[in-house]
């Protein structure tokens, strides 16, 4: 009678796909949320029903955002079911022009490219925490990176400030 309903961990139509939580952090989004939607044959393209939004903390990680969104999803699903039962649910088609895709995460994504700017690296470390995680190679050994901070140029010593980006 109603079809299948899904709780998706993004504010659709942004971040359709398997990695919406992590990509929101990696891309520096200021907010995220959950969306209830009708399922269809195409991934995350069904009509939307309800959304709930959360502001991302400046040090938000993939894990911390996952935990926040998981706490929001259940109550939103219950509200959606109530609206479906009483006939007040409204189907909202997704705008294709606003859609983005959040691809599946791969372990290789965590290999830090030290030529990226510092802000991008910091968001990557936060977004991929704790899985798949980030890492680098130092003297042939793999080193996991769990946290990092971007420092202001003014706080560096003269030799640190003169170092090539990516110097560890």
Residue ranges and their predicted role:
Residues 96-168:
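Internal anion-binding site segments
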Residues 1-101:
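Donor/substrate-binding cores of folate-linked one-carbon enzymes
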